[in-house]
């Protein structure tokens, strides 16, 4: 495949959220080998970073000409390097200047693609505007650099948060090949989170995606996923199990499966022992107890804090069933780690005091103060199970609710520094499109338990049994919770009973399995997806008129030129019929000059608490006023033009309009101190859907 410039867009570039960050960061060097260090550009969001978070971005002007080309762009762009192995070229997008155009942008996507953004909120708008901004920046790069050099390009967008770039470029730069990759589906993740049906994948064909997306309040995100899957040149996902999900929920079967690689990361016995000791010390600080290193095993579960989807519930349930069994095994004990980032504050003061030798106190279960401990699922389940970490108990649980990135004042180690110290990784996922956490465990030589509901679980099951791979795959599809918990309990006991030599054999098997996941073994799948995307872009390129493939320049506008912005209507050749030239336009009432102040009055909600002003609009057409829920903008647009002309000739009405307009101007230009009233909702007018209950009505009444 000839080298093409590869733009890769993700919300997780320089922004660790979940497994996609690992996917992209771990294969940078393989990508650079194929596209060249200067042919790969990662694009991520310019998001605020809390103080103390490890920096992932370093400013670096790797192309001064590009900086110059983007300096006047409406999208803010930071140029630099992503601080992962390979340090790829990186652009961070600041989409804040697009906020004012949000409705226009979303409206255009609705008109062209049927993208339903009606029920979106800012957790939807912000990523969509980021991706749209990324598309605008790529369009500028295409115009200034790629077209003159006749250079082909590929854009791969990960997840719905990046998909708007594909939609923009389909029109703005159709010769660029596009790949959309979903690492999970929004609707699938939400459906699974209810844990309602153990036959999740078998029952997908009976799901109505639109109905369920609306019921679960993910309709806009689901719509973006569906549209992107439909419109991209190549649609990909990470596993066969997720491909099945995509087919039923998004309406298109993925063209290529892109398994996630990682490779082996074997550690020396000394480093493993050091990591194990750090985990013991952290547990002792948390519980205040002491552990016999020879009789205690360390279990670990890590990942996103998706309580049901990640199998946290069944993990704790199975562990809670072990005390009697452990007591009968010569006093063996287990420490059950749950490394799941949650809303947290500082390390618990009592634990901090213990670390500095100044306090004992009762045992703890969580290393940090939680923002909402009352509603924390792990805390509540531990309470229900009676796990209190009392001294000497066979089962202790330690919840670590932070990102282990080495910046915490108490836990200075990173996740990958601590992971090798675990004896067993336990990942009994209910929903797991791939499953990086068991793969990471295996890569560091830690035996693991996963399930047939994980893409990695299904892949590794095809490589052999537990003794060959180091991984046990539990059945979860079609199995009820109690049976899964019992099976996991039995699997844990079998591991606990293994002689030390057998556990060492499993570690060696893990490393061999991890070697199979080296990115060099999986990049062929990416090459296939990119080949298809380039072919699709090349086919469209042949169909484009030459002026679309020329470096655009701003034409001189005149009434005869037929020019509209950057797009110029070419004159028809002699003997030819000119092609139709279409433009979107809006039909709206033009107010008579005498009534112009009504437009300004309508634009200021001041009229809402002045009944005599509201009556100006009501007198225009009382029936229409009520029908439109007292919406003055809609009224002025929809009332018959003849009625507006009649009112313009009514001297008394015009005088009243002028008087009240002057009153509004005077009242809004007072020099008195201003008061800003902040509230989440306001009940101001029926057509303004900004309230949901009594709080909004109260706020509106105050105004």
Q: In which residue ranges do the predicted regions lie?
A:
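Catalytic cores of nucleotide-sugar-dependent glycosyltransferases that transfer UDP/GDP/TDP-activated
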Residues: 1-703
